[in-house]
Structures are given as C-alpha cells and as structure tokens.
C-alpha cells in the first residue's frame, strides 16, 4: 500500500558533523573496534547519566544478555517482566532457564504496575525487569526499587525506548541495579542502525563486563614480554560466565559521542510535537493517551493511544482500516502481549493475569512519529485522524 504518511525505519537525519565523525574513523582509526572512540563514548555516556559505569555493546538485547549473566539467574529462579513490552525484554532471561512471570500494566500509564508486581513476588523471585515503554519513565519507579530492595530483588531497567527522559533530575537507567539502552535505527538517536549501552551500580560487577563482552579477552598485566604467552588473555576471571562478542565498533562509538551532544535538543523537538498532537485531540474521547505527570519524564519515542470505541461503536481495527486505506496514514499496533507469543507459550510461559495489558493491546494505536516527518505531513496526519474519527461516528 502506498502511504502519504508512513511508518519510517529511520529516526533521524545525520548532520555533517556526525557523518564526518564516521568517515574520520573509517580513514584513520586503528583498531576499528575496542579502541579509543569506544572509551570516549562510554565516558561521555557515563557523564550524561550521572557518572555510573557504562559499556558499549552491539544492541540493547545484548545489554540485557550481559545483565542476565551478571544477575546469575538460573533454573528455579523467577523473573517478573511486564507482559506488554517488546520480546527482547524477556528473551535474555528466558535463555537462563528461569521462570518468566508476566506482570500487568497500569491502565493510565500503560506501564508496569507495582500492585501487579507485588502480587507476583515469591521467595523465588530474583529479578524484576521494568520497561520505560514509549519513552516514559514509570512514575513510581523509585517506589518499585524500594520495594524490590526490601525483598532483596534486583531491578533491571529496560531503557531501550526512553533515553532522554528524566524523573526528579535522574536519568532513566539509574534508579535500579542495571540499565540497558538502545541505539537501534528507530530510536531517538541511532548509531548506524544498531548499538547499545549497559550501565550498573556495582563496581565489582562492572569490572567483569569488558571480558564478558569480548570473548574473555583483556590485556595481560605485568608481562615480561608482550608476546608471552599470547597477545590477549582469555583467562580473565569472570567467575565461570561464558563470554560473548558484543563489541561496538569505533565508527558507531564516534558517532554516538557526537549524537549525545544534540540528544536534549532532539528530545525537546519530540516533546513539542507530541504536545501539539495530544492537544489536537482534547475533544476526541476516542483516543486515550498515556497519563503524564511530569513532562521531563517522557522522551516521546513513540506516539501511542488507546482507542475507545464507545463514541462510535466501532473497533480499533475499523479505525486503522479507514485511516490507512482512505487517508493513507500508516498507524500500527504494538506490542503483542508476551504470554500470547507462540515462542513463550511453547516454553511454558503462556499464562498471565494481565487484564489491563490485554485491554490496552487490543485497542492500542501507534502513530507515525519520526522526527524527520515534515510539518505539513504531521498536520495532515492530525487532520486525517480527526476526520476519520468523526466519520466513524456516522
């Protein structure tokens, strides 16, 4: 189908400075991975989030893989995860053999509910994964972390969609024990389509990450000769954890450092557009948006709403059909509840008591919201949605 306003796989346009940063690495960097540009990016990102240790990786899923390793989750343990999130929030913990337990979401924020978490905690609960979905920090994240600490449970923040959001002056990913960030091609900033960062509070755990991230390799210390016994050491003490190769390239790292410099301005632009969009529908009860108590806590990665059909007697799917076929606006649906996935069903995780998540998913709409969309296309989308909603009323 040919759309006038389509769902884009590209979140931003690179500046000449950003392009030149990549070209410079292509021409001059030696090595092309695990070099000075990675160190600079990790340092810049650490400064941005307040000083916690940070490590660049290939993507946020691999950041969560490393976190799953470091939490030592295993068969017999339980990991609580919201049922409404992208599958990558859960798969790394599923690999461990632990039991995945699905938590419900709050009906107003569409984010994981503390009450649901409390109802699911058992003596076997080892980790709670919270997801700051659509760009919004969970409003009561501090309460969730406090509760988890009282139960000796680790908190992992999936910040893949929320970079740029802050709550009480704290950046997402710094409330819990671990944080994972994404620079995928559709995220608010992207390092050539893929990329990620892991952050954590525990300094002792942080020392293990370079080895786990890169096949156990680390420079020999106090060597008499640089070649004895070999150029790199795979005997680094990582306490029995099998290492991976999740290395971020030098080109991606150099680009990431430059992109961080305009993250705040990009976030401001997204907030302004999101505000305009939401205000355009104050007289349209058919669309229920996330409840936002603190604007700075939202980086507006995505623009989502719950379709309420009481006004028109129509369904979400009828709305999407009209919007796409007549007005050529490509709105989509996200994210399939994880307990409904065939993968998780086959693994024994097909049960959940998540009525809010089910209701939201069955009626949710995600509108195109890439920053490269022209103002005229953005206005056209708003006008088309209004017209479609009125048309559905009959």
Give residue spans per PLM region.
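Conserved PLP-binding active-site segment in aminotransferase class I/II-type PLP enzymes
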Residues: 1-70, 74, 130, 144, ...
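Conserved PLP-anchoring active-site segment centered on the Schiff-base-forming lysine
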Residues: 65-122, 127, 323
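Active-site phosphate-binding strand-loop segment of PLP-dependent enzymes
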Residues: 108-191, 197-199, 203-207, 366
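Active-site-adjacent capping/gating segments
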Residues: 162, 169-170, 174-176, 233-240, ...
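Active-site region of PLP-dependent enzymes
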Residues: 162-168, 175-302
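Conserved PLP cofactor-binding pocket of PLP-dependent enzymes
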Residues: 215-231, 276-281, 318-353, 359-365, ...
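Short, conserved charged micro-motifs
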Residues: 310-318, 374-379
